[in-house]
């Protein structure tokens, strides 16, 4: 029996980083995205965010490429959200996304980080947070 795990911290942002996912209705978006991820045979460990972006910790199935999963999440949830009363100002997702490979040993720390998004963003903008993530990963901003 094969056993694999590819763990990714994925970040997607709204079009033009506009605050179009209200806190009061964000759980509807999270549930819809959770269903997409589950339907792709991937495991969602945590999802959370604020009005202009979402963080996900995902165990990627060996049957799907990371870029295909992100595309399916963005396309499916965008089409759905535009039809919902919960997101009257939602126009879609931005073109870019971040996906950072993670060690299973860091899973709990990343879940904690995702859980505390509202706290992080009292002190840091999305742009600052994203730049920090890119630099910590050894990539260029």
Positions of PLM-derived features:
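Basic nucleic-acid-binding interfaces
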Residues: 1-141
